[in-house]
Amino acid sequence: MNGDYDRKFPQARALYAYMAAHPGKKLNFMGNEIAHFREWDEKREQDWNLLDFPKHREFAAYMQALNHLYLSEEALWNDYSGNGFEWVHAVSQNYPDTEHSCVFAWKRRSENGRQLLCVFQFADRADCVTLPLSEDEKPELVFDTDWTEFGGAAPKQDEVLTAQNGRAVTKMAAFSAKFFVVGKRDEAETEADEIKPEQKADTEVTADELITAEPIEKLSENSSVKLVDGAWFDRAVVYHIYPLGYCGAPQYNEGEKTQGSRILKVLDRIGHLKALGVNTIYFGPVFESLWHGYDTSDYYRTDSRLGSM
């Protein structure tokens, strides 16, 4: 693996997850399960002393959990039919052009119809990955290579992807993979996510009633509005602008000097925002820098309840 000691482990976890999810039978040499540094050698035993180090113990626990997942999910090993594999068009926020994208996704299916959505992110920084998803699908996270129990940074917790206009977004750590079991949403869940027509009857926006846009710095000047991981306060919302329309942002052209008011003109679902009671959208003044690889994810948040713009 490339990089220093700490960076090798997430890469190895992502690689073995890719191997487990890829069609075909698996072969691992002894020693791989403890992140051996040297080649397997039939003339000497493994360097079991590596398990004295936390990183290697965590990696051994990871390999054990991955093997258990492989055995328990028939879709991963019952691969005798071409119907058991389907590519999924995953889009990277950091590299929206497919030539430089480091994200991949596919579905594995078992003969009994159970589906596993496998998402991979092989770049060296966190990314926001957009996936196509039908409204009745309910992918639930069952495995994340970045969980802390494996030596990663993400606490083990539930994650359920929700479709907005046929797309869903998941945040991926650098060199990571996620596996989701794809179930079906029941009618009650679907109805709860929908906005009733009568609720938005009086919320259409006219040309003279554009939602205001302000620099995000004003958040600190307004005591009635507070940003906490994208939560809403006083009917205001922070909306993260990404290039090329991915992750639910409006589209704009590279090189264009974009102002908040001009962004608002291309929003095609203003009425949807008004129906949710949103009167103000705060835009960060970072449009041009996004084109030069500046990662603003630590400073701006997207509230997924907005839906896709």
Describe each model-derived feature in a short phrase.
Residues 1:
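Active-site core of glycosidic bond-cleaving carbohydrate-active enzymes
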Residues 4-9, 13, 18-28, 32-282, ...:
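Carbohydrate-interacting/catalytic domains
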